[in-house]
A protein has these predicted regions:
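Short coil/turn segments at alpha/beta junctions that flank glycine-rich nucleotide-binding fingerprints
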Residues: 93, 109, 125-129
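Conserved acetyl-CoA-binding loop-helix of GNAT-fold acetyltransferases
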Residues: 102, 108-121, 144-148
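Feature marks short, surface-exposed loop/turn motifs that line or immediately flank catalytic pockets
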Residues: 86, 104, 139
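Conserved phosphate-binding and hydrolysis motifs of nucleotide-dependent enzymes
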Residues: 74, 78, 110-112, 150
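C-terminal "cap" of GNAT-fold acetyltransferases
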Residues: 3, 7-15, 127-171
């Protein structure tokens, strides 16, 4: 399983697991992530030159990382980056969906849904117990997508409320 056909999508749409050693895939990965980084939902700033130069190689060096790409013909139009983690409660792997990006002119065509279906398949093959992701509250289109494909807010006990996402920069 490396590629899926797109039956209800554009006949030229194909979704595949990225091969970080493939120059076409590596270039697509950087271009799509840079486009996403410049979007308000991605922070509004381009990737650093360091990230652009080293991203594919650094992901390839991490066996817990995998990415999914969407192509419309020869044009790269979508990306999902994933990092495998570990659920201590389930004592099984989990997969965190770290980035989901579709070029603005290609949104609304369920490309992200198709990519997430392949992420689900790869994650199950890895024995993952669940998928996790974080999304900005104001990114309503993404929230609707994630709910449509089965994601929900995370809580252990309703009395304790939903989990919140925090970060702390180390440099």
């Amino acid at each position: 399983m490396t590629e899926t056909a797109a039956s209800s999508f554009s006949p030229s749409l194909r979704v595949c697991r990225a091969d970080y050693a493939n120059p076409v895939h590596a270039r697509a990965l950087v271009q799509l992530l840079d486009s996403y980084a410049q979007d308000p939902a991605g922070g509004g700033k381009p990737l650093s030159d360091f990230a652009k130069t080293h991203l594919a190689r650094e992901l390839a060096a991490r066996p817990q990382a995998f990415s999914v790409l969407a192509f419309d013909g020869d044009e790269a139009v979508g990306l999902v980056n994933c990092i495998e983690g570990f659920s201590t409660f389930a004592c099984r792997p989990l997969v965190n969906i770290h980035d989901v990006a579709v070029l603005p002119d290609h949104r609304g065509r369920r490309i992200a849904e198709k990519m997430l279906a392949l992420v689900d398949e790869i994650s199950r093959e890895r024995g993952a117990c669940k998928l996790t992701l974080e999304v900005l509250q104001g990114n309503l289109g993404a929230v609707r997508l994630y709910e449509r494909v089965g994601f929900a807010g995370y809580q252990l006990d309703p009395a304790m409320g939903q989990a919140r996402f925090f970060q702390k920069w180390l440099d």
